Amino acid sequence: MVNTQNQISQTSELDYIVNQPYKYGFKTSVESEQFPRGISEDIVRLISKKKDEPEYLLNFRLKAYKKWKKMSSPSWAHIKHPNIDFNTIIYYAVPKLKKELKSLDEVDPEILDTFNKLGISLNEQKRISNVAVDAVFDSVSIATTFKKELSEAGVIFCSISEAIRDYPELIKKYLGTVVPAGDNYFAALNSAVFSDGSFCYIPPNTVCPLELSTYFRINNEESGQFERTLIIADRGSKVSYLEGCTAPQFDTNQLHAAIVELVALEGAEIKYSTVQNWYAGNKEGKGGIYNFVTKRGLCSGNNSKISWTQVETGSAITWKYPSCILAGENSQGEFYSVALTNNYQEADTGTKMIHIGNNTKSRIISKGISAGRSKNSYRGLVKVGPQSFNSRNYSQCDSLLIGQSSQANTFPYIQVQNPTSKVEHEASTSKISEDQIFYFLQRGINLEESIALMISGFCKDVFNELPMEFATEADRLLSLKLEGTVG
């Protein structure tokens, strides 16, 4: 009887730990300029005109819009959500600005205060670590820090709107080459209506002197966010990039449909890390962000490398598969992921590793943590082409269940068309057991700390791949999510 009471007590406390409010759910009161609801060719033209874009980019948008109109929303993922009414969404919403911003002094103090509350200081004198930040608020980039310091090394880091204006040769050459306008339903939508995002170019034989980071904030309840990121690492260069994101707490759902394109030329290396903490909805599953993202990297040069690392804790729905196309000989692709779902969250995420060149290597480490009534699925494709000789892949997919009602799924797809190649895949599903909790409690460690330690150990292979400045933050984010500070 005593044992049963202890089990009930532990279960109740565990439920309390994983069902706490979202820390970043505040809304910023700021006057905004926005287009009418709904999507049409007129809206696409308005966005392009508002941004004073060249004709080739308008044509790119219109082509994408026409393709999107002929496509259907994907239904194969292991997620369920109401049909999205795309005509109720505002596709362009920006804080009202009297003029083009020349310095942070001209940014609305409310917006600066928002990023300060999020721990993202846009004041270069107040930086804590070696990080340059591009801050995106709804449909516009508010500020990019340390541009002068980066430019001295030849590095271009700015909003994609600035890049379209100031570096048209690079945009024409690379935009849409990794993720074509009609790649998938949400990529086509983004290609038609994207408003801002980040652009980065690392010149040959240059190691970027700062970590680069973009922070995305959705503030408007009725608007979606459709940013686009393009990173080009020229031959022999290296760059590390981190993105983070949050949103206010609304009872309705907002749509986030982004594209990230990475291009690594000969001998170049790109490390792209994400800490995703969009609002996930309340414990009854009401509200939250629908997160439909296309991320893909192209190792076009020999001896190039792209590494994706992601920590996913937010969003009501997550649908994203950061991928690598290994075209160059001896190129490498890596994917390290922690995805934590809770309450009624649903995540269908994973990666694709496409081996084309000889002697290519890929590594996949995926950790899924499911709590409450959530569903957490890993979906991965490893494809070895017929001309990809001596290629190698290793995949490890581990799932951890917390509670009685959560789900974990693994959907691996493996296609090998070359007999000289080697592919390994292993998967496991485990549960935090009463014996494990009892072991910690007997040593004076409370339930919250016990679970945090077990989660940290479970995720260490991924956290070790994050940039040093953010590994501790990611560990803390998961702990806080389970302790009750970040719901």
From Swiss-Prot:
UniProt keywords, alphabetically: Chloroplast, Plastid
A GO-annotated cellular component: chloroplast
InterPro entries documented for this protein: Fe-S_cluster_assembly_SufBD, SUF_FeS_clus_asmbl_SufB, SUF_FeS_clus_asmbl_SufBD_core, SUF_FeS_clus_asmbl_SufBD_sf, SufBD_N
Protein name in the entry: Iron-sulfur cluster assembly SufBD family protein ycf24
Domain of life: Eukaryota
GO biological process, one term: iron-sulfur cluster assembly
Compartments (UniProt record): Plastid, Chloroplast
Family of the protein in this entry: Belongs to the iron-sulfur cluster assembly SufBD family.
